[in-house]
A protein has these predicted regions:
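Structural detector of well-ordered beta-strand residues that form the stable sheet scaffold
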Residues: 28, 73-74, 100, 126, ...
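Phosphate-binding site of ATP-dependent enzymes
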Residues: 142-228, 232
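Glycine-rich phosphate/pyrophosphate-binding beta-alpha loops
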Residues: 258-269
Length: 288
């Protein structure tokens, strides 16, 4: 039986274990963080045939990958590509894929640069760290004073020498937008969810991240949304991808992507989700 390494032991591990075992793939946990990694002992490492998604901790992941020598369904380059929100926006725009109007700011810059960048948009605007996930650090600025206040905090973080990514995005705000996560496996949309805040949490809030209390409800993904998500995966060259879409009455745009998406309940995906995922894993292992 093929052995698949997962660097996560959370929801995705538990949800995909049995469906993949039924398709000839055994899953094991390849721990990449909160441990001591012996770098000079390859003999004692667990044996795997293929990795699922490269560890989010890139430094530890690179060391572990050297010890195990694995092919990955989504490799280090895929994770880096998707994590770079500004790079994704630029690449998709170049591919004629609709995205929000966005300016990337690379610190350190003067206040006048921020004012000029925001002047190209209209308030309110969204401010987000370029590399963070789960909606962490994302804020809405309703005017120039609030924007500059948010930027002050980002500047404090970016002043720390160990901060790797010293960039952030200023992005147009799409009011009352519906928020979708569409999954693409091996170039084909395999289902998706709409993310909504429950009624008791919705008052005065606009973020729809599941990690911030939103609920993900399975939907029949419309044809236009499917084509758009598939086009995103093709443009970025990533085989297993979560594509975040925002839809208003007039527009459908790609907001972000995730090359390390959490797998939701099977009922929220198309019937062939696990079949396609298993075939992708097996082909990745065979291509080495």
């Amino acid at each position: 039986m093929l052995r698949l390494a997962l660097s996560t032991h959370a929801e995705t591990f538990e949800r995909i274990r049995e469906p993949l075992v039924d398709r000839g793939i055994e899953i094991g946990h390849l721990q990449a963080k909160q441990r001591a990694i012996r770098l000079t002992d390859r003999e004692s490492v667990d044996r795997f045939d293929v990795g699922f998604v490269f560890p989010g901790r890139l430094m530890e992941g690179t060391a572990i990958n050297a010890l195990h020598g694995l092919p990955w369904v989504n490799n280090r380059e895929d994770v880096l590509t998707s994590r770079n929100k500004g790079g994704v926006i630029a690449a998709l725009h170049a591919a004629d894929i609709p995205v929000p109007e966005t300016v990337m700011v690379s610190n350190p810059v003067s206040e006048s640069v921020v004012i000029k960048a925001a002047g190209e948009l209209s308030f309110p605007v969204i401010v987000k760290p370029n590399s963070a996930t789960r909606g962490i650090g994302v804020a809405k600025a309703t005017d120039m004073d609030s924007l500059l206040g948010i930027v002050d905090y980002l500047n404090l973080v970016h002043d720390y020498r160990a901060t790797g990514d010293k960039s952030y995005l200023i992005q147009e705000y799409l009011p009352d937008a519906r928020d979708y996560r569409v999954m693409v496996v091996d170039g084909e949309c395999v289902g998706g969810v709409e993310r909504r805040l429950p009624e008791e949490l919705a008052e005065g809030r606009w973020k729809h991240n599941v990690h911030r209390g939103a609920e993900a409800t399975g939907i029949e993904v419309p044809a236009e949304h499917r084509r758009l998500a598939e086009g995103v995966a093709k443009a970025l060259g990533i085989s297993y991808l979560g594509v975040d879409l925002l839809e208003t009455d007039r527009r459908l745009v790609v907001n972000e992507t995730n090359a390390r998406p959490t797998v939701d309940a099977a009922t929220k995906y198309d019937d062939d989700f696990y079949g396609r995922l298993a075939e992708l894993i097996k082909r990745t292992a065979a291509d080495t």
